[in-house]
A protein has these predicted regions:
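Active-site-proximal alpha-helix that buttresses catalytic centers in soluble enzyme cores
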Residues: 2-9, 16-120, 171, 176
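Active-site signature of alpha/beta-hydrolase-fold catalytic machinery across serine-
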Residues: 95, 227, 231
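Phosphate-handling substructures
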Residues: 34, 97-186, 302
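Beta-strand elements within well-structured catalytic alpha/beta cores of enzymes
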Residues: 23-27, 82, 210-220
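Alpha-helix termini
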Residues: 64-76, 99-124, 184-211, 259-262
Length: 303
């Protein structure tokens, strides 16, 4: 966005503040063999399970446009996709990118969990997935690749020198909070630029479909998504969650970003959305039937 394009944002641009100015979608990675075998893995990685591979295909199909530029999720094409550098998350981001017609993370990308966190890019649509080490799962140190702190055959832990030290709960939550703020700040700035560029106060930009607004997709892990939601959307916590906000593999949390001239607000629009998964790939809690997929229509916000 060049300086010549900047105009004061008229307060009338915010008259319908109930409509999000931008969307943020958090996606958990596909199921890995470690998930199946109940092996603790944070920064270590395991191959995807057969069900995880099927989830990726279903996720890719669900992101493919079905009408205009919307898809099964009734979401606009991402303006930017950012992924954790850990393999299971990268593969999940690739599925989303293929469905959306966006370039996957380049093979030349060398980002790992120990890399410096990436800087937020320019406020424009990006046609290639980016990696951010800040989206990595928590580092569990010597507990990596264990079940109840016991080694598990087939899950060899890298040498301590290579793996490094564990990340404390406090340090992990601070990282998730800081990285979350970075990306929400980026999205807010983009949303405000977008409102500026809509033109005069009597324009019909507020009535346009959601495919016209900025949409950031972050592909990460269960613990990271839990930490983000607890800190940025604490009302998301339900009694059934106990100490952890549950997220199924490849599920989506879609968040609306609302802006006024002096503030911003996040609103959870979709929670743990697995509408793309059929009953054979949507695991349910023991003794309970899986919840049916959500059918919230985001375009209703613009109707």
């Amino acid at each position: 966005m060049g300086e010549s394009k900047k105009r004061p944002i008229c307060s009338s641009h915010f008259m319908q503040e109930s409509r999000p100015a931008a969307l943020l979608t958090l996606v958990r990675h596909a199921e890995s063999m470690a998930n199946v075998d109940r092996v603790l893995q944070g920064v270590c990685d395991a191959p995807l399970s057969p069900r995880g591979l099927k989830q990726l295909q279903q996720l890719e199909d669900a992101w493919r446009p079905t009408s205009a530029s919307l898809n099964l999720f009734d979401l606009p094409k991402p303006t930017l996709i950012v992924t954790s550098p850990i393999g299971r998350a990268k593969r999940t981001s690739c599925a989303i990118a293929r469905g959306c017609g966006i370039n996957t993370l380049p093979e030349s990308d060398t980002t790992i969990f120990r890399s410096a966190h990436c800087e937020a890019p320019q406020h424009l649509a990006h046609d290639t997935v980016r990696a951010d080490a800040g989206l990595s799962e928590r580092h569990f140190g010597t507990a990596e690749c264990t079940r109840k702190m016991q080694p598990v055959q087939g899950y060899e832990r890298p040498p301590s020198k290579e793996l490094g030290r564990a990340e404390s709960v406090t340090a992990f939550y601070k990282r998730a909070a800081d990285v979350g703020v970075k990306w929400v700040d980026w999205l807010e700035t983009y949303a405000r630029h977008n409102l500026q560029d809509r033109g005069s106060p009597d324009s019909d930009h507020q009535n346009k479909a959601p495919d016209t607004i900025p949409h950031l997709v972050l592909v990460s892990h269960g613990q990271w998504i839990n930490a983000f939601l607890q800190q940025h959307l604490p009302d998301t916590w339900e009694k059934a969650d106990l100490y952890y906000i549950q997220s199924a593999n490849t599920s989506l949390f879609t968040i609306g970003l609302h802006v006024t001239p002096t503030s911003r607000r996040l609103e959870l629009l979709r929670r743990n959305d697995t509408r793309h998964l059929d009953e054979t790939t949507r695991p349910s809690k023991r003794g309970r039937r899986a919840k049916p997929p959500q059918r919230t229509t985001l375009t209703a916000l613009w109707s």
